[in-house]
Amino acid sequence: MAAGNAVKLVLRSRPLAIYAQSGRSFSTSFQPPPNNIYHGQPVYNHIDIGSRKITDAAVARNNDVEAVFVVTGASRSMGLEFVKQLLTRTKGKIVALILRPGSSPALDQALGQLSRDDRARVNVLPLDVTNEDQIVNVATELNETYARVDGLFNVAGVLGDKTTTAGPEMNLSQLDQSWLQHQFAVNAVGPMMSTSKLAPLLKTRKGKKYLRNTGSKESVVVNLSARVASMSDNTGGLAWYSYRMSKAALNQGVRASSHELRRQGTWTIALYPGMTDTDMSKPFQTKMMQEKGLVFPVEFTVSRLLDIVDAMEEENTGGFFDWDGQSIPF
């Protein structure tokens, strides 16, 4: 365990960012910044991705043609990139959940560029993560079609742009009850309800008995969180009340559910992707941030997050980690 009020970790040397996907490598001139320094004491050990470690569980999961990977918020940005990279990193089936099928030009274009075999691996279904009935419908369809889920990626989220939305707030006077409730509905309630309804399909063992003859003995639930959700690390800065609160609630949900999910062979994790070049972050990007390499290409971010998922062990379940595998204090 790391100790101390402030933790500083040594940067693992990476002269060039490499995106490794199923035997293919994509190089870029982008170089990530030095590791973050977090205030507070992490609860979990860090996940080492510097050695390109991949666990036996991940190897089995990724190589299983019957495996099913579910991605919420798959219409664009990171959700869409998860779909793309899961197609190359795994051999299983991908379920892309979006608000309205047929309304995402980016997803439609990406699917149109796939080979016939890869296109057959992708199933696009409607899901509004704030609608419990739709979550139940998705769970029912997945049960009838696949009878299993090996990986759930809760990517759908909302921050706002302060121009067309009531947030993110800069001070208490800007708090809006409807917006606060919407943030919780999308960022905390949605992922937890999705996990709840898909938990029976994620189950891989009963007691010590494994229930599947193929694939890994562990399934995974991956939740996208944010550094600003850390209470220990909150020593000042912008308010962003509703976003911070909703993501902190998600972290607690991940931590609490990890104890129950562990018993059924499911590992769950909260990941901070860093400032990534997405539609959500664009209103808050600056030229200085881009020049200093503080805005990550979406391909880099998703590749790193999948590296962490492939390297995580049971001891990491319930943890909160950043894009480089560092454990973030809650």
What are these regions (language model features)?
Residues 128-148:
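Conserved Rossmann-fold cofactor-binding substructure of NAD(P)-dependent oxidoreductases
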Residues 158-189, 199-263:
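Catalytic loop of short-chain dehydrogenase/reductase
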Residues 87-107:
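Conserved glycine-rich Rossmann-like NAD(P)H-binding loop of the short-chain dehydrogenase/reductase
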Residues 270, 282, 286-330:
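C-terminal helical subdomain
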Residues 114-133:
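Rossmann-fold cofactor-recognition segment
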Residues 2-70, 84, 93:
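Non-catalytic terminal and boundary segments that flank Rossmann-like NAD(P)-dependent oxidoreductase
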Residues 162, 230-234, 272-285:
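Short beta-loop-alpha junction of Rossmann-like oxidoreductase domains
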Residues 72-85:
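N-terminal Rossmann NAD(P)H-binding glycine-rich loop of SDR-like oxidoreductase domains
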